[in-house]
């Protein structure tokens, strides 16, 4: 039988290369790239887990896995796999996984810019990873790529706020276990700086500037300009030379060699192979060139061909002449300065031709530079340019794609700023400047051509030594440009002459002049007419001086001048001629020998760039000193004046000469000082930046070429003499220079002694040692001098003396040297040269001396004393810190011998000093990080032995130990609470934590040993310990649950969970306290609570029992645990709000403490009560925290109220007030000013009008400046009144104002404030009467299902809607808050299935507030006053729906239409401190049909009454609502008369069946009768205000009213209104408000409402109030259900309405006056509602009116109703009204009296109607919801191991694969 078998080593690790979806519980889902640890295998299946989620094991197909090499460690359960990849590959892989997760989040958050950045970085890393894995890269490229990879990772981590990775120089991640603390700190600093620079670069690139680039170029000693010539667009017609060079327009001179390209007449390069490879690099540019005001790139084009282009007869014409053609100039200053960099950009340089034949190219160049633009006519050059850092060797290495061996190199004319030792040159730059040539026998000036060549003294021409430009071959003679018939040509043409060094002294330059004719025949006959020359070597052996030379032009007579011997003896320049006593200015021709000097003149300039030839005679004299020893002293002195460049060129020769002079005069001391000074001068030169690269040459000379065995004695002696005479003025300066050269001098001394020992076997050792000792003593004596003259020399000695250590110890005892240095430092006077002294010590630490144990024994005590002295005085902290860092770093090394004793020295002398320095240092100090690193390093390097020894160092002074521990605890706590290192320095922070943890535990042992017994107990010390330990445990960087799983695993693996370690230590320390525990209660409750709240289960279990221990302690002491209880409640609030605590903690707290309490004899009952109290508080606080950051502020308000009510219940006033203000702030954020006011009022009620002092917790806000309760209460009242005013709750504001006014008037006597207050009150009264206040709707909302938080679950709330908020809007808002909730379709209470389901169900419908008028208003009062109480100060709400009882009456449905009314009572009145309150009681009543009719009639009368009153009060009101209201009642076509009531209730049969209803029937008749006078008044007002357009409408209404009035008065009697409504406007007649209002005892509980016809029947509905209803018969009942309306009927009804509308002519007239939105047609089951526009709500467009026809519970009447046939044709829309039931407004919304308000119209708002109010256990009508899709049918599981696994799907494209794996492309 086969079975699962463990995998072999090579099968342990693999990567999924395709997605796999688990198809069973035992399987493991895989994503592409998942790495798996494979444990077992079985027939094509593997079992294991992914490394990203190790807890989930499962099986998966082997065919989906690519196996990889891995290192397997451990066995069985402890087996782990470590990938066998390169560390860098592993890092890239981990990084990619981490970034990809964040990448997805960025996509979800729609952070596009960052998403793209991360995508580019991910793609780069994937590509580079592939390159590294390919193994094909050469080592240097691999190294470069590694740098790029690590830089990219570090940059990406920073921008994604991930941890900083620290690396060594090779880019490998540092292991903190193997790295010293100081090195780790420095690595973090470097990494952070590099990433910061990289960020700046990215930022600069976005701004198109590259500051770093400019800085980089400025810091580079050598630069080069790369030029790529793309094309020359120029119509030349002949061959040409294109000469490119750099030019300084300010100095008008060329600064580089030419780059020469020969161009053919066909428009292509002559060398066709270089067609696309015309590249050159202009090298040797330096900082001086960057400082030039301007640099131009100049291109000169020289035509090579005929004299004149226009000549056509080419056969007879001279060819091959170099003629000026034109120039092209471009300013490259910005490119050279690094401001512009784009190697791909092609620059067009416009071409400027020469204007005439006598236009010199130099002149044209200057003209073009001066001109603003060039008329180039499309002619010019195309080039690309790029500035490159480095010399030619670096450039070739770093930019091989630009510069290769074929690239022409054009050097700067002259030496670069930094002369490289290997740069051997012997170049002479010759420039043809100008000439002046007599025309001689010719009629016009000559066409002069100058030919340059090089000859030796034998007259032999040197071949191929002239270079016309880079990129061209060497030539033997150079011919100048010819200017046509110009007497004084100016050429400015430069060529380079490169002659072998051995030929220079024999060579001379020869210039011949010839007239060139345009005719070939004439030209051949033209001979050389003159000659000039100049020798390259002067008579004194030096080379030709740089600069201009005015050459003598000799006439070319026959063949005389062909013989060099003939003219070489003659002077070559005018200067030489003058030296020989001849006149150089005489116009007459002079004859010298056989040669005649011409009148012509000719100037050249030269520049020698040679590392082998010198122009300095003094240097030459020194090098050849033996030839004239009498001048030796002079030559040695003159050497100090020679240009440095000349000296370094001949460095080895010069040094040889100096030491030869010294050795050959060994007996004499004559030249010793001079040679020493010369040596110091040369060493000083090499220290100069310009010649710093010669330092290796000097080093090599000392090691390999130096051979003066006795030099050490003389050098030592001279140096000592200088030191001894340090205070002499002349000596001081030279000694200073010698000190700067000390390192090299000692190298010479040591090397000399070693050479001597090799020859003479240590002969004279004692003398040598003694001479050195004498020298050091002299230096030490000098250091103790107080003279001001020696300060500079002493500073130099401190700086340069340490540099000799590593050399001197080769020939001198290191211990003696250490003693010398100790004395050297101690001799420096305190207070002088402190910083130099400290840096000197740093250099000593860096030297080999400090790595030797015995030397350290001597040096370290001195160093620690110095550090202690300066640290205590806060002097030069940076240098102190550096010194201590370097010492600690050396002591960390394993190769420096024993260090335990030295760590002890540092601990004893410096630990406390460093601690105090850290404590005194501000967090903003740049050095704080360094000092903390030093302190951490000391602690880390201390062993247990050191800690034990530390206490002994304090001796018997117990207070010292206490102080030390106090300082340390406070410092640790500060460092933990406010870390000095950035959050992303994770490794540094973890190392620090590890060190601190060990130190804290070590110090805890000291506490237990020394400060626990009764006599020595230190309360504050223990207190500080506990606070520190808790701060350590709760610090952010240790909260592992906040980190990614990978980071958590790394930390646990490296450091473990330090929280547990210290948590258990805290527990033990607490129990160790014994009898002292009571001293820590209640102070330690908070810290211990913080600790127990850490989400680590074992830690919680171990530490929660401490609370019981605290309860016991306090109980034993005081017989209660009140202090503990108060403290834990207060602190728990802060902690939970701060994010700590969870459900598990609540359970553990409950369980553990209850267990302990129940076992205790006395605490069983009180303890249990306390635990339950805390658990209840925790529940509320956790609820509060859960939604504290929720967008849903209403939930936040609910939870806040729950918490504050709890605090009120347990009488925690401080906490209660705290939450009141949280609630108030939330209300203000939502503009709930009314609720904010009620909330503040709760605080005000806690205060008295007294002078009692205000305790701190009462003044919760900084804004309140109050010392007494009375003052605070006054301020609160002012604020509350302000909020009530903003919330339009003027009645409440007035009530408070009266109370405040009483105080101002009778207690405070503050009449000024009283005056202000009364003015406000007056305004409030006016507002009540005049300002329209929108009536809010109220909604009942039930939350069912276990998915809701506890504070909502299973509860019903009444919500107060916002202004103008309809039910649909409210529901939408509600469902936005709970997007997963399902809206219930019925208004019936839900069953247990819904209540217990895991989901969320919301039930929402409109309810109507029940008016509860204050007794004072039970008399005639203005509707404006009463209307406030209809929707405010309400606690009871009703919801009504019609039900049928008895037999169905087809003639009159109202006879058996009952109303079922549900009354909801809330916990508090609305509005209150919330916009909603929980329903506390629900009961139901039934309203009979008759009572319903009475209510409806009463409301109709009230409505007419109210509107009439409004028009009397304000004649400017629009007439439209009144028109519709009146017409709806009086027009029999609309309402059908009173037939419905009469048929239903006014019959003998009804009275027989309901004998008790007699009184009510009379009441109904009375109400009908009273309607007539109201209508009469309304019609009178209407008649007064009606427009002419509507006059027919009014007349018809009057006719209808007349009929109605006659009928009513006949049957029900006449009612008469009081005299004049106008006269009674101030106090309304009783008949207007109360006469039709039934006594409360006889009235039904509330007004029934068919509102339930639509749960949205809210006042916000258009046309939902302002009319009455008439009882009519139902149109049709559906056979299947009374609750369903046939769709066909709906459609038919709509069509009928449209038809009626079309048929009515009056309707058209009506609509002209009334806008289309003024009338909305609604139909209901029992009535067809024709509603006038509600003045209460803004008018909405028809599209927003609910399609009430869709509801089946409607009362409708057939259009062919009998009553409508008996009346005149209607002028109003055929929407019917009924008196028997109210409009949807009246049922569950507002009463008819609400018509008082005429708010502004609201914006359009589309919505879908939803009429759930009437439905009884039936679906609400509205937009149909499609049935949910069938549950997803899962595929059958794949075959398990008994069968082979499914094959992987076929390979897809990368994009598909990415999509499959969930990666966003």
UniProtKB/Swiss-Prot annotation:
Basic and acidic residues composition bias: residue spans: 1680-1694, 1705-1716
Renumbered residue ranges of the record's region Interaction with NCK2 second and third SH3 domain (minor): 1793-1819
Gene Ontology MF annotations: GTPase activator activity; guanyl-nucleotide exchange factor activity; SH3 domain binding; small GTPase binding
PTM sites of type Phosphothreonine: 1767, 1772
Motif SH3-binding per UniProt: ranges: 1799-1805, 1838-1843
One Pfam match: TPR_DOCK
Residues of the DOCKER domain: 1207-1617
Region (Interaction with NCK2 third SH3 domain (major)): 1820-1836
Modified-residue entries (Phosphoserine), positions: 1681, 1743, 1751, 1756, 1761, 1764, 1858
Keywords attached to this entry: Apoptosis, Cytoplasm, Guanine-nucleotide releasing factor, Membrane, Phagocytosis, Phosphoprotein, SH3 domain, SH3-binding
Tissue expression profile of the protein: Highly expressed in placenta, lung, kidney, pancreas and ovary. Expressed at intermediate level in thymus, testes and colon.
Entry's Gene Ontology BP terms: apoptotic process; cell migration; integrin-mediated signaling pathway; myoblast fusion; phagocytosis, engulfment; positive regulation of epithelial cell migration; positive regulation of substrate adhesion-dependent cell spreading; regulation of postsynapse assembly
Domain of life: Eukaryota
All residue ranges annotated as the SH3 domain in the record: 9-70
Residue ranges with Low complexity bias: 1639-1666, 1756-1766
One cellular-component annotation, GO: cytosol
Annotated segments matching region Phosphoinositide-binding: 1687-1695
Listed PROSITE patterns: C2_DOCK, DOCKER, SH3
Record remark on domains: The DOCKER domain is necessary and sufficient for the GEF activity.
Subunit-level organization: Interacts with the SH3 domains of CRK and NCK2 via multiple sites. Interacts with nucleotide-free RAC1 via its DOCKER domain. Interacts with ELMO1, ELMO2 and probably ELMO3 via its SH3 domain. Interacts with ADGRB1. Identified in a complex with AUTS2 and ELMO2.
Protein name (database record): Dedicator of cytokinesis protein 1
Annotated organism of origin: Homo sapiens (Human)
Gene name as annotated: DOCK1
């Amino acid at each position: 039988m086969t079975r699962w078998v463990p995998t072999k080593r090579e099968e342990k690790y693999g990567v999924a290369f395709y997605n796999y979806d688990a198809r069973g519980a035992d399987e493991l889902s895989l994503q592409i790239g998942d790495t798996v640890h494979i444990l077992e295998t079985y027939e094509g299946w593997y079992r294991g887990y992914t490394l990203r989620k190790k807890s989930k094991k499962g099986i998966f197909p082997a065919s989906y896995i690519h196996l990889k090499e891995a290192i397997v460690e451990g066995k069985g359960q402890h087996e782990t796999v470590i990938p066998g990849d390169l560390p860098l590959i592993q890092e890239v892989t981990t990084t990619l996984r981490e970034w990809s997760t964040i990448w997805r989040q960025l996509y979800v958050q729609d952070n596009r810019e960052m998403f793209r950045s991360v995508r580019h970085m991910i793609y780069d890393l994937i590509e580079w990873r592939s390159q590294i894995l390919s193994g094909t890269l050469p080592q240097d490229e691999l190294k470069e790529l590694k740098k790029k990879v690590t830089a990219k990772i570090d940059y990406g981590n920073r921008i994604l706020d991930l941890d900083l990775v620290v690396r060594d120089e090779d880019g490998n991640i540092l292991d903190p276990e193997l790295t010293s603390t100081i090195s780790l700190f420095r690595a973090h600093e470097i990494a952070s700086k590099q990433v910061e620079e990289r960020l700046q670069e990215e930022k600069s690139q976005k701004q198109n500037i590259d500051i770093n680039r400019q800085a980089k170029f400025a810091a580079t000693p050598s630069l080069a300009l790369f030029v790529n010539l793309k094309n020359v667009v120029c119509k030349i017609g002949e061959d040409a030379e294109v000469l490119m060079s750099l030019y300084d327009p300010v100095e008008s001179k060329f600064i580089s060699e030419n780059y020469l390209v020969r161009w053919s007449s066909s428009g292509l390069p002559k060398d066709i192979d270089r067609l696309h490879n015309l590249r050159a690099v202009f090298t040797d540019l330096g900082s001086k060139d960057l400082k030039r005001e301007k640099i131009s790139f100049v291109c000169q084009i020289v035509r090579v061909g005929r004299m004149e282009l226009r000549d056509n007869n080419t056969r007879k014409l001279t060819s091959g002449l170099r003629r000026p053609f034109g120039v092209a100039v471009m300013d490259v200053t910005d490119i050279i300065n690094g401001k512009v960099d784009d190697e791909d950009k092609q620059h067009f340089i416009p071409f400027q031709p020469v204007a005439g034949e006598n236009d010199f190219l130099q002149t044209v160049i200057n003209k073009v530079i001066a001109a603003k633009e060039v008329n180039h006519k499309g002619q010019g050059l195309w080039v690309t340019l790029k500035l490159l850092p480095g010399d030619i060797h670096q450039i070739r290495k770093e930019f091989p794609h630009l510069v290769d061996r074929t690239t022409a190199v054009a050097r700067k004319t002259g030496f670069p700023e930094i002369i490289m030792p290997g740069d051997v040159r012997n170049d002479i730059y010759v420039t043809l400047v100008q000439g002046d040539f007599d025309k001689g026998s010719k009629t016009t000036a000559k066409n002069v051509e100058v030919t340059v060549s090089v000859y030796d003294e034998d007259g032999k021409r040197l071949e191929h030594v002239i270079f016309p430009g880079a990129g061209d071959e060497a030539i033997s003679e150079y011919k100048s440009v010819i200017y046509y018939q110009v007497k004084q040509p100016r050429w400015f043409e430069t060529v380079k002459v490169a002659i072998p060094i051995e030929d220079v002294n024999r060579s001379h330059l020869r210039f011949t002049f010839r007239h060139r004719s345009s005719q070939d025949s004439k030209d051949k006959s033209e001979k050389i007419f003159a000659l000039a020359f100049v020798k390259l070597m002067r008579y004194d052996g030096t080379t030709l001086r740089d600069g201009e030379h005015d050459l003598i032009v000799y006439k070319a007579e026959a063949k005389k001048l062909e013989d060099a011997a003939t003219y070489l003896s003659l002077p070559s320049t005018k200067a030489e001629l003058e030296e020989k006593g001849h006149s150089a200015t005489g116009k007459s021709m002079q004859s010298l020998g056989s040669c005649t000097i011409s009148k012509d003149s000719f100037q050249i300039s030269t520049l020698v760039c040679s590392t082998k030839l010198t122009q300095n005679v003094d240097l030459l004299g020194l090098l050849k000193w033996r030839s004239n020893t009498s001048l030796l002293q002079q030559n040695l002195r003159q050497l100090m004046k020679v240009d440095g460049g000349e000296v370094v060129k001949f460095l080895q020769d010069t040094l040889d000469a100096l030491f030869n002079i010294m050795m050959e005069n060994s007996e004499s001391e004559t030249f010793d000082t001079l040679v020493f000074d010369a040596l110091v001068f040369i060493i000083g030169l090499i220290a100069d930046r310009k010649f710093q690269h010669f330092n290796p040459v000097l080093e090599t000379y000392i090691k390999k070429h130096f051979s003066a065995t006795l030099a050490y004695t003389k050098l030592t002696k001279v140096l000592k003499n200088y030191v001894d005479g340090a205070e002499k003025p002349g000596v001081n300066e030279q000694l200073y220079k010698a000190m700067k050269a000390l390192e090299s001098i000692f190298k010479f001394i040591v090397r000399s002694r070693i050479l001597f020992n090799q020859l003479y076997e240590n002969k004279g050792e004692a003398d040598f040692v003694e001479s050195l000792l004498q020298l050091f003593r002299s230096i030490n004596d000098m250091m103790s001098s107080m003279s001001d003259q020696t300060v500079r020399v002493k500073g130099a000695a401190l700086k340069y003396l340490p540099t000799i250590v590593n050399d001197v110890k080769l020939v001198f005892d290191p211990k003696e040297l250490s003693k010398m240095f100790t004395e050297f430092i101690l001799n420096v006077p305190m207070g002088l040269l402190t910083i130099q002294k400290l840096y000197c010590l740093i250099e000593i630490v860096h030297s080999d001396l400090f790595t030797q144990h015995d030397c350290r024994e001597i040096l370290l005590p001195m160093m620690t004393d110095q550090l202690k002295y300066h640290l205590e005085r806060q002097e030069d902290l940076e240098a102190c810190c550096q010194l201590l860092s370097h010492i600690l770093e050396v002591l960390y090394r394993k190769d420096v011998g024993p260090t335990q004793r030295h760590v002890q020295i540092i601990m004893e002398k410096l630990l406390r000093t460093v601690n105090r320095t850290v404590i005194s240092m501000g967090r903003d100090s740049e050095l704080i990080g360094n000092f903390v690193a030093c302190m951490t390093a000391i602690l880390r390097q201390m062993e247990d032995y050191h800690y034990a020894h530390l206490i002994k160092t304090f001796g018997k002074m117990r207070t010292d130990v206490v102080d030390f521990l106090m300082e340390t605890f406070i410092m640790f706590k500060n460092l933990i609470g406010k870390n000095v290192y950035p959050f992303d320095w994770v490794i540094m922070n973890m190392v620090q934590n590890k060190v601190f943890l060990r130190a804290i535990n070590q110090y805890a042992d000291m506490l237990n040993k020394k400060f626990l017994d009764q006599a020595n107990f230190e309360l504050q010390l223990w207190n500080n310990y506990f606070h520190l330990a808790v701060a350590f445990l709760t610090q952010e960087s240790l909260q592992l649950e906040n980190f990614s799983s990978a980071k958590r695993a790394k930390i646990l693996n490296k450091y473990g969970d330090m929280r547990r370690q210290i948590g258990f230590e805290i527990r033990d320390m607490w129990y160790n306290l014994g009898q002292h525990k009571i001293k820590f209660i209640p102070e330690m409750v908070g810290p211990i609570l913080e600790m127990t709240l850490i989400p680590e289960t074992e830690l919680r279990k171990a530490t929660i029992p401490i609370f019981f221990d605290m309860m016991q302690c306090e109980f034993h002491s005081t017989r209660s645990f009140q202090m503990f209880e108060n403290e834990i409640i207060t602190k728990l609030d802060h902690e939970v709000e701060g994010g700590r605590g969870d459900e598990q903690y609540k359970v553990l707290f409950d369980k553990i403490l209850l267990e302990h309490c129940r076992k205790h004899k006395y605490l069983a009952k009180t303890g249990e009560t306390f635990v339950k109290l805390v658990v209840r508080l925790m529940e509320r606080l956790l609820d509060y925290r859960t939604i504290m950051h929720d967008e849903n502020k209403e939930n936040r308000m609910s939870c806040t109220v729950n918490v504050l009510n709890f605090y009120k219940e347990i009488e925690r006033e401080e906490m209660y007030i705290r939450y009141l203000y949280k609630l108030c702030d939330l209300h203000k954020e939502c503009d709930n000013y009314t609720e904010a006011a009620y909330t503040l009022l709760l605080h005000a009620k806690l205060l008295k009008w007294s002078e009692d002092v205000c305790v701190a917790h009462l003044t919760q806000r900084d804004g309140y400046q109050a010392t007494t309760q009375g003052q605070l209460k006054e301020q609160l009242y002012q604020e509350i009144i302000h909020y009530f005013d903003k919330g339009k709750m003027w009645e409440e504001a007035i009530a408070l104002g009266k109370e405040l006014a009483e105080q101002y008037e009778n207690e405070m006597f503050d009449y000024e404030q009283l005056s202000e207050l009364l003015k406000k009150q007056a305004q409030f009264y006016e507002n009540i009467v005049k300002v329209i206040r929108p009536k809010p709707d109220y909604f009942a909302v039930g939350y069912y299902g276990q998915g809701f938080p506890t504070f909502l679950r299973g509860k019903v709330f009444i919500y107060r809607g916002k202004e103008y908020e309809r039910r649909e809007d409210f529901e939408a808002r509600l469902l936005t808050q709970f997007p997963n909730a399902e809206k219930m379709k019925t208004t019936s209470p839900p069953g247990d299935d819904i209540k217990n389901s895991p989901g969320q169900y919301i039930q929402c419908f409109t309810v109507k507030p029940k008016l509860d008028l204050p007794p004072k208003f039970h008399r005639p009062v203005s509707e404006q006053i009463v209307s406030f109480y209809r929707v405010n100060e309400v606690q009871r709400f009703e919801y009504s729906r019609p039900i049928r009882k008895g037999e169905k009456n087809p003639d009159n449905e109202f006879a058996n239409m009952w109303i079922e009314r549900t009354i909801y009572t809330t916990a508090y009145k609305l509005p209150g401190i919330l916009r909603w309150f929980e329903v506390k009681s629900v009961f139901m009543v039934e309203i009979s049909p008759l009572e319903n009719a009475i209510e409806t009639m009463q409301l109709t009368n009230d409505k007419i009454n109210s509107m009439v009153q409004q028009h009397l009060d304000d004649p400017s009101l629009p007439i439209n609502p009144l028109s519709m209201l009146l017409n709806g009642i009086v027009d029999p076509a609309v309402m059908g008369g009173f037939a419905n009531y009469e048929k239903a209730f006014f019959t003998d049969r009804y009275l027989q069946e309901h004998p008790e209803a007699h009184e009510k029937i009379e009441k109904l008749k009375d109400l009908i009768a009273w309607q007539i006078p109201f209508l009469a008044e309304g019609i009178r007002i209407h008649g007064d205000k009606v427009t002419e357009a509507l006059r027919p409408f009014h007349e018809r209404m009057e006719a209808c009213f007349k009929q109605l009035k006659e009928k009513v008065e006949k049957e029900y009697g006449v009612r008469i209104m009081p005299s004049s409504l106008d006269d009674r406007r101030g106090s309304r007649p009783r008949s207007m408000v109360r006469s039709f209002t039934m006594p409360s005892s006889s009235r039904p509980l509330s007004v029934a409402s068919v509102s339930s016809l639509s749960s949205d029947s809210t006042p916000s509905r258009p046309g939902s109030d302002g009319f009455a209803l008439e009882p009519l018969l139902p149109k049709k009942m559906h056979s299947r259900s009374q609750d369903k309306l046939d769709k066909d009927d709906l459609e038919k009804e709509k069509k009928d309405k449209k038809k009626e509308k079309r048929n009515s002519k009056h309707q058209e007239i009506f609509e002209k006056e009334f806008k289309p939105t003024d009338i909305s047609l609604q139909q209901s089951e029992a009535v067809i509602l024709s509603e006038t526009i509600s003045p209460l709500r803004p008018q909405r467009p028809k599209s927003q009116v609910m399609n009430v026809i869709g509801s089946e519970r409607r009362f409708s009447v057939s259009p062919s109703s009998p009553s409508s046939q008996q009346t005149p044709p209607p002028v109003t829309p055929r929407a019917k009204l009924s008196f028997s039931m109210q409009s949807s407004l009246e049922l569950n919304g507002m009463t008819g009296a609400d018509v008082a308000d005429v708010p502004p119209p609201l914006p359009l708002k589309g919505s879908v109607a939803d009429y759930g109010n009437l439905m009884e256990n039936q679906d609400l009508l509205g937009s149909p919801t499609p049935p949910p899709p069938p549950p997803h049918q899962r595929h059958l599981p794949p075959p398990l191991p008994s069968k082979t696994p499914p094959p992987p799907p076929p390979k897809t494209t990368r994009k598909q694969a990415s999509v499959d794996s969930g990666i966003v492309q």
